[in-house]
Amino acid sequence: MRNPLYHWTHLELARYFDIYDLLNEKSAEKIWEETKEKLSSRDYSCRQLLQKVNAEVVCTTEDPTDPLEHHQALVKSDFKVKVSTAFRPDKAVLIAADGYNDYINSLGLAADMSINSFKDLCDALRKRIVYFDTNGCKLCDHGLDQIYFENYTESEVKSIFSKKREGKESRL
């Protein structure tokens, strides 16, 4: 019982669901069903739960391609909790990831421009930062698993990006 997760789980079951049963292999299914039923009701909507705990601000993380229409709707609504977004450009720098060129095409559409060079990529990201800022974003969030370092020149970076856009392999 030294793991705080044990205590947090029981605290949250009691605080949010009025469930005081001990969670174990015998009670798990009953607790699952009870919480599932409550979460499907209007009283347990995300908004209601946030208001119940007196949340003042909630931050989400959004990709630069996100149109932010949900955030715009929340700003116009009567929801009392401030919902802000954080700009999360991870996919724009993960050049070795599957689907990278498709992602860059999506980013180009979101920025209303073609991305054919590294400069274009930087310009598209700047445009999206301005768009996010216009929509109240003041934070940036990065979720990279690892940060690699190689000493590349600017011309090498441009060349690697161009080769990737052309579908050619290049050393990373």
Kindly label every feature range from the protein language model.
Residues 1-172:
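Metal-cofactor-binding active-site regions of metalloenzymes
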